[in-house]
Swiss-Prot record:
Keywords, in A-Z order: Cytoplasm, Glycolysis, Lyase, Magnesium, Metal-binding, Secreted
Binding positions for (2R)-2-phosphoglycerate per the UniProt entry: Q167, K342, R371, S372, K393
Entry note: cofactor: Binds a second Mg(2+) ion via substrate during catalysis.
Matches recorded under InterPro entries: Enolase, Enolase-like_C_sf, Enolase-like_N, Enolase_C, Enolase_CS, Enolase_N
Protein name according to UniProt: Enolase
EC number, UniProt record: 4.2.1.11
Annotated GO MF terms: magnesium ion binding; phosphopyruvate hydratase activity
UniProt entry tagged with the keyword Transcription regulation: no
Length: 432
């Protein structure tokens, strides 16, 4: 009953108004899975390729009809008749047929959409929720946890049109007893932050991920206004709520220096920027820093890991691009201590699960993440619970493309109850 009978690809629109690929996988017995590929703004150079048409007369060149054509053509022909429950087999067929290292033939957006739709169809045929099916694919049946959210409430960098260099300033409601309570705490801080910003005469328009995007005097001022909002919401910073940052440092790395517009165009060496971040962690309870240096600055990362790695979580995003080959090298060289997991960086569910497993086996944490270009697809919520990853990054408390994932987590927690504990601070590297 889990034989694939039909595969459909289509072009839909993401949260930035750009096209993306949606796929449907139909099985015998009428079971259907549907999924859409997300899309990033600040991307690592070694990510799997997102195939765009390049036809400037359509969607400013961002159309995905070639990728959709791959879904409806060669991919469909290759997997119709196969067993959807064999996720690794389905993914391997698509990857082998594409034949390139970075999935540039069909596009990672085509392969991923089909990979996720296939998993959803297989889960439906087994009569189980997606998170339960993912736990089985992961070799950890029945093992679940609810992730601690990293809520991006101030957006800068490539996600906003402001003068803030650091791309994301996040809160983590570590003192909550459930994901539902964590989401409530995040929502309350988010609304108090609007009041704080308005009180200072600042803009409360939101960026790509639903966080506010004000012009601030410095990067540290973003932390200061968040601290004010946490207090106004009645929470204790450092106890109830901790802070996290995504520097996306590759975006302000120029000619071997880190140039910060928000600090008066000051240029830092790798070591100086690491100490700039270290100073911030002394002023505020920052427990996680992502991409604290450029993706190619491995010597700098080794130094940063030496200085900060035993105190806080250092997450590699552009650094590792959800790629087991690169992650393996990072583990061997002692670079960072956590990986950001974005399944469109690698392009299939099977490879995503392999990256999570490799990280956990090495004592690294794995943070499941959205992209800045999203849809209503909430698969990452199921992925976080089904792999018991422990942390999720899916934006702020506004925009339906972000909130869809939080709402799915609320539903899953309700269904699983005590089978899926919310472990709070213990999930974050260096905070147990």
């Amino acid at each position: 009953m889990s034989k694939i009978v039909k595969v459909i690809g289509r072009e839909i629109i993401d949260s930035r108004g750009n096209p993306t690929v949606e796929a449907e996988v139909h099985l015998e017995g009428g079971f259907v899975g549907m999924a859409a590929a997300p899309s990033g703004a600040s991307t690592g150079s070694r990510e799997a390729l997102e195939l765009r048409d390049g036809d400037k007369s359509r969607f400013l060149g961002k159309g995905v009809t070639k990728a959709v054509g791959a879904v409806n053509g060669p991919i469909a022909q290759a997997i119709v008749g196969k067993d959807a429950k064999d996720q690794a087999g389905i993914d391997k067929i698509m990857i082998d047929l594409d034949g390139t290292e970075n999935k540039s033939n069909f596009g990672a957006n085509a392969i991923l959409a089909v990979s996720l739709a296939n998993a959803k169809a297989a889960a439906a045929s087994k009569g189980m929720p997606l998170y339960e099916h993912i736990a089985e694919l992961n070799g950890t049946p029945g093992k679940f946890s609810m992730p601690v959210p990293m809520m991006n409430i101030i957006n800068g960098g490539e996600h906003a049109d402001n003068n803030v260099d650091i791309q994301e300033f996040m809160i983590q409601p570590v003192g909550a007893s459930s994901v539902k309570e964590a989401i409530r705490m995040g929502s309350e801080v988010f609304h108090h932050l609007a009041k704080v910003l308005k009180g200072k005469g600042m803009n409360t328009a939101v960026g790509d991920e639903g966080g506010y995007a004000p012009n601030l005097g410095s990067n540290a001022e973003a932390l200061a206004v968040i601290a004010e909002a946490v207090k106004a919401a009645g929470y204790e910073l450092g106890k109830d709520i901790t802070l996290a940052m995504d520097c996306a440092a590759s975006e302000f790395y120029k000619d071997g220096k880190y140039v910060l517009a928000g600090e008066g165009n000051k240029a830092f060496t790798s070591e100086e920027f690491t100490h700039f971040l270290e100073d911030l962690t002394k002023q505020y309870p920052i427990v996680s820093i992502e991409d604290g240096l450029d993706e190619s600055d491995w010597d700098g990362f080794a130094y940063q890991t030496k200085v900060l790695g035993d105190k806080i979580q250092l997450v590699g995003d552009d650094l590792f691009v959800t790629n087991t080959k690169i992650l393996k090298e990072g583990i061997e060289k002692g670079i960072a201590n956590s990986i950001l997991i974005k399944f469109n960086q690698i392009g299939s569910l099977t490879e995503t699960l392999a990256a999570i497993k490799m990280a956990k086996d090495a004592g690294y944490t794995a943070v499941i993440s959205h992209r800045s270009g999203e849809t209503e697809d909430a698969t990452i919520a199921d992925l976080a619970v089904g792999t018991a990853a422990g942390q999720i990054k899916t934006g702020s408390m506004s925009r339906s493309d972000r909130v869809a994932k939080y709402n799915q987590l609320i539903r899953i927690e309700e269904a699983l109850g005590e089978k899926a504990p919310y472990n709070g601070r213990r999930e974050i590297k260096g905070q147990a």
